[in-house]
């Protein structure tokens, strides 16, 4: 009897230990290694969403945007935040936030692409997988474009760090990178759904519409001027400000941009809002989307990605204002830029804030030397901020008006003068600016040079303070000339 009890006890203990072992061997629900993440399409989607964090960042609209004909920084030259704006060359002038954030997202894209391509799926899950792959290609291309815009020739990798044969990399010729990311975007536009298909619920993710616009933008930058040098020697004497040496390459790139814009325009899904102000009121209010015009916007929400949009680059609001909360603008509009707008251009008083707000909520006029950036206004928000420095204001990375102006620019180049389609695209942007009154938009230029100069001006008026002016001027080889003119005025 004792032996029977003993055997039962031993068996019971064995079962318990076995159960305990099985319990301890249960997979972790929070495990985030590649095998776990890419075990289902829903988990894989979460990984893809994480890739978007590096497509835009504060350094892009602050440190790297100042110092043009549009705006300037109020910080002193002894402050590292202002070095890039004032073209002070030292180790601290580099806006490292762009570099580290972009490469972080690129690594996530590379890891996702490897994981997604290894998944074995069928039906709707397989379709989703292909779309997520296209998303990652488009996000990675966007990150590399930002790196090239600010740093020129940079390290270029399309595989995860764990798969690299070396952890060090020299600079790669930007033309090689451009070829790679243009090919990625061309692959992406074939797979991504149009926004109207409803696959994406907000323009915070890249639809086919947005991918075409990003492709056009990338092609125009690839065709533009840039500072090239010998990447074998890094000899400063080899520095040249030039376009790609092969004119046929330049023409091919303009053709890519032209056709990408044409694809968006001919689809007919996108349009301009009737009022310019409504674009930015919606962005400031939060949770209001206008995908017909704002084709791709950077989501600013939560404790990890939320930025200072409107705090650092908006209206000046008194610290004691209880309704809107304090702001501390460190960027101001040049008086010359404000005065360059036509008086009846409705974009002027949206782009430029010619008042501040006192503690009681009253508007106080400011002098020309203290003109604020007007597109980002905390008094346009629908509710309170997440915190003083967290405003929940999304950033417009791509708008339809940009697509129209890129199309006009490409058509002008390819035809040695503006086509009727180029003029129509240009005039569509102008008409909205002047409240639909065709008699106020002026005569549209008809020669290559005059139309190009009109595009240069119109992009300044339409896209001011949205992060493109400085690098637009570089790709046109107009930065030095424009800065000299601004300083003289």
Set out the residue ranges of the language-model regions:
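Conserved, well-structured interaction surfaces
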Residues: 40-57, 78-151, 165-201, 373-395, ...
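Short, surface-exposed recognition loops and adjoining beta-strand edges that mediate ligand/DNA contacts
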Residues: 61-74, 193-210, 224-315, 436-450, ...
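TPR/Sel1-like alpha-solenoid repeat signature
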Residues: 212-218
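Membrane-proximal, proline-rich intrinsically disordered regions
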Residues: 20-66, 237-238, 280
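Elongated scaffold/linker segments in the mid-to-C-terminal portions of large proteins
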Residues: 42-43, 48, 52, 56, ...
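Bacterial Sec-dependent N-terminal signal peptides
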Residues: 4, 13-40, 181, 216, ...
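Short coil/turn linking the two alpha-helices of tandem helical-hairpin repeats
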Residues: 148-150, 155, 196, 221-230, ...
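Bacterial N-terminal signal peptides that target proteins for export
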Residues: 1-8
């Amino acid at each position: 009897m004792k032996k029977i009890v003993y055997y039962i006890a031993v068996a019971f203990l064995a079962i318990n230990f076995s159960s305990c072992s099985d319990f301890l061997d249960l997979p972790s629900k929070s495990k985030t290694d590649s095998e776990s993440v890419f075990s289902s399409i829903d988990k894989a989607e979460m990984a893809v969403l994480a890739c978007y964090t590096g497509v835009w960042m504060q350094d892009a609209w602050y440190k790297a945007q100042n110092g043009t004909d549009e705006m300037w920084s109020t910080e002193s030259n002894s402050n590292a935040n202002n070095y890039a704006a004032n073209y002070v060359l030292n180790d601290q002038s580099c806006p490292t936030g762009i570099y580290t954030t972009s490469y972080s997202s690129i690594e996530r894209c590379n890891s996702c692409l490897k994981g997604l391509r290894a998944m074995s799926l069928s039906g709707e899950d397989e379709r989703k997988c292909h779309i997520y792959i296209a998303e990652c290609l488009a996000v990675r291309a966007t990150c590399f474009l930002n790196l090239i815009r600010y740093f020129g020739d940079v390290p270029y990798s399309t595989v995860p760090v764990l798969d690299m044969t070396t952890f060090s990399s020299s600079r790669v010729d930007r033309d090689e990178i451009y070829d790679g990311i243009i090919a990625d975007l061309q692959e992406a536009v074939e797979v991504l759904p149009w926004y109207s298909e409803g696959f994406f619920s907000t323009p915070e993710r890249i639809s086919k519409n947005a991918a075409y616009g990003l492709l056009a933008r990338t092609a125009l930058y690839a065709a533009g001027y840039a500072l090239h040098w010998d990447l074998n020697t890094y000899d400063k004497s080899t520095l040249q400000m030039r376009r790609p040496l092969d004119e046929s390459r330049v023409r091919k790139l303009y053709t890519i941009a032209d056709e990408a814009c044409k694809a968006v325009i001919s689809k007919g899904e996108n349009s301009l809002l009737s009022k310019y102000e409504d674009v930015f009121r919606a962005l400031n209010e939060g949770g209001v989307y206008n995908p017909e015009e704002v084709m791709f916007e950077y989501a600013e929400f939560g404790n990890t990605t939320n930025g200072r949009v409107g705090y650092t680059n908006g209206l000046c609001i008194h610290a004691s204002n209880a309704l809107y909360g304090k702001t501390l603008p460190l960027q101001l509009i040049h008086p010359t830029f404000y005065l360059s707008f036509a008086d009846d251009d409705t974009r002027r008083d949206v782009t430029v804030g010619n008042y501040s707000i006192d503690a009681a909520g009253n508007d106080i006029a400011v002098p020309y030397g203290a003109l604020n950036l007007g597109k980002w206004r905390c008094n346009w928000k629908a509710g309170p901020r997440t915190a003083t420095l967290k405003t929940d204001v999304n950033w417009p990375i791509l708008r339809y008006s940009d697509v129209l102006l890129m199309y006009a620019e490409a058509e002008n180049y390819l035809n040695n003068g503006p086509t009727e389609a180029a003029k129509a695209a240009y005039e569509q942007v102008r008409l909205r600016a002047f409240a639909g009154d065709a008699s106020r938009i002026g005569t549209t230029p008809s020669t290559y040079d005059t139309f190009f100069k009109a595009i240069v001006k119109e992009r300044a008026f339409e896209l001011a303070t949205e992060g493109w002016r400085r690098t637009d001027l570089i790709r046109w080889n107009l930065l030095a000339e424009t800065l000299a003119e601004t300083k003289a005025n």
